[in-house]
Curated annotation (Swiss-Prot):
Pfam families: Pyrophosphatase. It comes from Debaryomyces hansenii (strain ATCC 36239 / CBS 767 / BCRC 21394 / JCM 1990 / NBRC 0083 / IGC 2968). Diphosphate binds at residue 79. It comes from the Eukaryota. This is Inorganic pyrophosphatase.
Length: 287
């Protein structure tokens, strides 16, 4: 199954969109791409939204048809993540699992908080820097439970199956063995990254502990089941999410015509970013 990215417009602009294609036909990264890449369910598909070390806050659109990747905005302005010393931009290749949904209508029994209404967030910790719209095949290692402004915001830790270390990383304890300091730095980054924007420090459930692979797989299953209900129209409130898809013919929102509404690719060079995005922020008590 081959996926490619269709870029429309210039990065760092309000009009920038990245659609995902399967064999040249636009599909929804939220609904059409299978969660699992193999029958054994040991390899999963991940959509890269934000490549490591970049600042633009890119995300799968929940509201637009076929859910293209776009840059988030606040009060009409493009959003960028600040550089919290010693980090630059996002600490990992950051993205989402398709066919998952953190249901905001449900309170998780252990975090005591509702889902954040997004696909499951994924941090890919391999050595290669990804690209926007890349569909990576990954294996699951563990999960952190961020409590972001009162919502449960799971962060699944994964490794690209083609990474040189992939065969040695099979559960969360292997990460500390082969990549010492990575989990601590990841915890720190998620804790502090909103502080430069005037927001409070984020909190974690489980005292910041990164839970193991088995626990992570349970969370993935829960969010996969929540998405199944969403796409079938069985949820109490779908929160305005576009459910249009081009491959799930048994769903009411199946529409092959949706693909024809996607503009052709128009790759343009990135627009310049304001120099303020390069600033380093030094946060007391971060380390």
């Amino acid at each position: 199954m081959s996926f490619t990215a269709r870029q429309i417009g210039a990065p760092n602009t309000l009009d920038y969109r990245v659609f995902i294609e399967q064999n040249g036909k636009p599909v929804s990264p939220f609904h059409d791409i299978p969660l699992y890449a193999n029958e054994e369910k040991t390899v999963l598909n991940m959509i890269v939204e934000v490549p490591r070390w970049t600042n633009a806050k890119l995300e799968i659109s929940k509201e637009e048809k076929l859910n293209p990747i776009l840059q988030d905005t606040k009060k009409g302005k493009l959003r960028f993540v600040r550089n919290c010393f010693p980090h630059h931009g996002y600490i990992h290749n950051y993205g989402a699992f398709p066919q998952t949904w953190e249901d905001p209508n449900q309170v998780h029994p252990e975090t005591k908080a509702k889902g954040d209404n997004d696909p499951l967030d994924v941090c890919e910790i391999g050595e290669q820097v990804g690209y926007v719209g890349q569909v990576k095949q990954v294996k699951v290692l563990g999960v952190m439970a961020l409590l972001d402004e009162g919502e449960t915001d799971w962060k699944i830790i994964v490794i690209d199956v083609n990474d040189p270390l992939a065969s040695k990383l099979n559960d969360i304890e292997d990460v500390e063995t082969h990549l010492p300091g990575l989990l601590r730095a990841t915890n720190e980054w998620f804790r502090i990254y909103k502080i430069p924007d005037g927001k409070p420090e984020n909190q974690f459930a489980f005292s910041g502990e990164c839970k193991n692979k088995k626990y992570a797989e349970e969370i993935i299953n829960e969010c996969s089941e929540a998405w199944e209900k969403l796409i079938k129209g069985e949820t109490a409130d779908s929160k305005g999410i576009s459910l249009d898809n081009t491959t799930l013919s048994s769903t009411q929102t199946f529409s092959e015509a949706a693909a024809s509404g996607v503009p052709p690719a128009s790759v343009q060079p990135a627009a310049p970013i304001d120099k303020s995005v390069d600033k380093w922020f030094f946060i007391s008590g971060a380390h």
